[in-house]
UniProtKB/Swiss-Prot annotation:
Belongs to the LolA family. Its main location: periplasm. Residues 1-21 form the signal peptide. This is Outer-membrane lipoprotein carrier protein. Participates in the translocation of lipoproteins from the inner membrane to the outer membrane. Only forms a complex with a lipoprotein if the residue after the N-terminal Cys is not an aspartate (The Asp acts as a targeting signal to indicate that the lipoprotein should stay in the inner membrane). It is found in: Periplasm. Disulfide bonds: none annotated. Monomer. Keywords: Chaperone, Periplasm, Protein transport, Signal, Transport. It comes from the Bacteria. InterPro entries: LolA/LolB/LppX, OM_lipoprot_carrier_LolA-like, OM_lipoprot_carrier_LolA_Pbac.
Length: 201
């Protein structure tokens, strides 16, 4: 009886691993169909009890694997740009720019996963699929508890959401998406005159 139970458990485990691998592969293949896109986004942040913390909006441009321009326009302005090597974060309200190496940037955020679409990074997650919706759970504990993303078969991202360990949820809905090459100037950044530059490279 014990041997039968162990066999059943092993089959269930291997079956789950195969399903995770298939879902992970399908997600990557879908994302690989679109290498360059731009879209508007709306952001909703809620607490673990469902209370609204913040609503925001902005515009993003992505050119995989490592180029992106994320501009938050409301409620406060901020800009996050990757030129492929350096990650620039500009907060005009405090007149400060922070520069870090992209390769050392945290990978446990939804946007970094989407922008890079690196197979090695996806291996750090168990992935379940329900139609066009993919649910990701980190294999090792970090500040990200759960991540979901909805991607159409043609590779267009419709929405993504991240749940942190404290239960806070950040949801992003993409609209007015355009799939087309993006001018390289969108991924270049020069700190404005007079701002403080915190260079952590």
């Amino acid at each position: 009886m014990k041997k039968v139970l162990l066999t059943v458990c092993a089959i269930a485990l291997f079956g789950s691993q195969a399903a995770w691998a298939d879902a992970r592969q399908d997600l990557q293949q879908r994302l690989n169909k679109v290498n360059s896109f731009q879209a508007n986004f709306s952001q909703t942040v809620t607490s673990n009890e469902g209370a609204l913390i913040q609503k925001g909006e902005g515009h993003l441009k992505v050119q995989r694997p490592d180029l992106f321009n994320w501009q938050m326009t409301a409620p406060d302005e901020s800009t996050l740009i990757s030129d492929g090597k350096t990650l620039w974060f500009y907060n005009p309200f405090v007149e400060q720019v922070t520069a870090t190496w992209l390769e050392s940037a945290t990978t446990n955020t939804p946007f970094m996963l989407i922008a890079r679409n690196d197979s090695k990074e996806w291996q750090n997650y168990d992935v379940k699929q329900n139609g066009d919706r993919f649910e990701l759970t980190p294999k090792t504990e970090n500040n990200l508890k759960h991540f979901s993303i909805t991607v159409s078969p043609n590779g267009q991202i419709q929405q993504f959401a991240a749940t942190e360990q404290d239960g806070q949820v950040s949801q992003y809905q993409l609209t007015a998406q355009k799939v087309a090459p993006i001018d390289a100037s969108a991924f270049r950044f020069t700190p404005p005159a007079g701002v403080t530059v915190d260079d952590q490279r």
